[in-house]
UniProtKB/Swiss-Prot annotation:
GO molecular function: ATP binding; magnesium ion binding; phosphoribosylglycinamide formyltransferase 2 activity; phosphoribosylglycinamide formyltransferase activity
Binding site for Mg(2+): 279, 291
Organism: Leptothrix cholodnii (strain ATCC 51168 / LMG 8142 / SP-6) (Leptothrix discophora (strain SP-6))
Descriptive protein name: Formate-dependent phosphoribosylglycinamide formyltransferase
Keyword Repeat on entry: no
Domain ATP-grasp: 120-320
E.C. number(s) listed in UniProt: 6.3.1.21
Record carries keyword Metal-binding: yes
Pathway stated in the Swiss-Prot or TrEMBL entry: Purine metabolism; IMP biosynthesis via de novo pathway; N(2)-formyl-N(1)-(5-phospho-D-ribosyl)glycinamide from N(1)-(5-phospho-D-ribosyl)glycinamide (formate route): step 1/1
PANTHER family documented for this protein: FORMATE-DEPENDENT PHOSPHORIBOSYLGLYCINAMIDE FORMYLTRANSFERASE
Residue positions binding ATP: 115, 162, 167-172, 202-205, 210
Family: Belongs to the PurK/PurT family.
UniProt-listed InterPro entries: ATP-grasp, ATP-grasp_carboxylate-amine, ATP_grasp_subdomain_1, PreATP-grasp_dom_sf, PurT, PurT/PurK_preATP-grasp, PurT_C, Rudment_hybrid_motif
Coiled-coil ranges (or none): none
Length: 405
């Protein structure tokens, strides 16, 4: 990278985020604290990140022509994808043409944009342990994959069905028996980010717990990329959507070592610089790869209260070629604050009560419209005892209520 400049000047270091939700908003703030000029892009106006960026644009980021036009007009030093629904072939072309550098790389963005690319990389190319899986394009194919057909072993019941492209658990469900298959297929069709009718069905792993292993690829003093690991983050998901997380999650040494081996293997292959959220299932000393995001992870919001450098600051530092530290400041936990109502421009009651919970912090994301199950904020609590922090974070989150203005 060139030396950091001054925002809104000819020498500014300019970074464009594609996707400006709550995670992107925190990345933008971290970049601005390092003197970076920021450009926030999203598919709807007044997205959280657009509210804090120097400049903002609203486009369909999956439209190749619109995306190319915007990037060529703005000419940022870095493009940082923060969501999956992006015209990744356009990013690959622009990177190959030398127009822009994509974080971590355009290839990594393409491979992780949907579950098929990254699952085939992890299981078939890298040989990492995963759940058994099939990709299906119809209800009939889904049923055949579960039952076993064409010489393929049956996925069986129970199993998990997900759209190949979705976020926050949308379209994901568990199938316990034949009576659930039709409903799971229908839910996947309405929950995907694109309407291509393709799903992944996975055999169910009876894991003890699941973690996110935040993994940072950053330049060392010698200019070579080094890999850093945050303490493991435990989390609870409901239908694939993050509900609460905590750090550190206790792990046996063998399981922790295997988790980090898997995380290093997949992130080394994806390459580039930045923070990756690697999701893993753990049972005893066995570990299975689930997914990876080449960007800050929703379960990693807990690091805003647990680490000296949170996941957003780590991402910002790493992509700018700056030193990083993954040191833990205090154990802690996070719990989601839901909208609870369907309404635009809500107001929040109970914030004062939430902040009376000892060692608590609240982040309200500023989303312009609330839905009943939309993530509108997060409660954060630090405590020497992680279990206490979890209880207190959920207590604080439950005190914040959105209502129509």
């Amino acid at each position: 990278m060139k030396p950091l400049g001054t925002p809104l000047s000819p020498d500014a270091t300019r970074v464009m985020l594609l996707g400006s939700g709550e995670l992107g908003k925190e990345v933008l703030i971290a970049l601005q604290r390092l003197g970076v000029e920021t450009i926030a892009v999203d598919r709807y106006d007044n997205a959280p990140g657009q509210q804090v960026a120097h400049q903002s644009h609203t486009i369909a980021m999956s439209d190749p022509a619109a995306l190319r036009t915007l990037i060529e007009a703005e000419r940022p030093d870095l493009v940082v994808p923060e969501i999956e629904a992006i015209a990744t072939q356009t990013l690959e072309a622009l990177e190959a043409e030398g127009v822009v550098r994509v974080i971590p790389t355009a290839r990594a963005t393409r491979l992780t944009m949907d579950r098929e690319g990254i699952r085939r990389l992890a299981a078939e190319t890298l040989g990492l342990p995963t759940s058994p899986y099939r990709f299906c394009d119809s209800l009939a194919e889904l049923q055949a994959a579960i039952d076993g057909a064409d010489g393929q072993p049956a996925i069986g019941y129970p199993c998990i069905v997900k759209p190949v492209m979705s976020s926050s658990g949308k379209g994901q469900s568990k199938i316990d028996g034949p009576a659930d298959v039709q409903a799971a297929w229908d839910y996947a069709m309405v929950g995907g980010r694109v309407s291509n009718g393709r799903v992944i069905v996975e055999g169910f792993i009876d894991f003890d717990y699941e973690i996110t292993q935040l993994t940072v690829r950053a330049l060392g003093a010698d200019g070579q990329v080094e890999t850093h690991f945050c303490d493991p983050i435990g989390h609870v998901q409901v239908r694939g959507d993050y509900v609460e997380s905590w750090q550190p999650h206790p792990m046996q040494p063998a399981a922790l070592a295997l988790s980090r081996h898997i995380a290093r293997t997949v992130t080394d292959n994806l390459g580039g610089q930045g923070l990756f959220g690697v999701e893993l299932f753990v049972k005893g000393d066995l570990v299975w790869f689930s997914e990876v995001s080449p960007r800050p992870h929703d379960t990693g919001m807990v690091t805003m209260i647990t680490q000296w450098q949170n996941e957003f600051e780590l991402h910002a530092r790493a992509i700018l070629g700056l030193p990083v530290s993954t040191a833990l400041k205090s154990p802690g936990a996070s719990a989601v604050i839901y909208g609870g109502v369907d309404a635009p421009g809500v107001v929040y009651d109970g914030v004062d009560e939430a902040l009376r919970v000892p060692n608590s912090e609240i982040r309200l994301f500023g989303k312009p419209e609330s839905f009943e199950r939309r993530r509108m904020g997060v409660a954060l609590v630090h405590d020497a005892d992680v279990d206490v922090a979890r209880t207190q974070a959920k207590l604080a989150a439950g005190k914040v209520k959105a209502r129509p203005a």
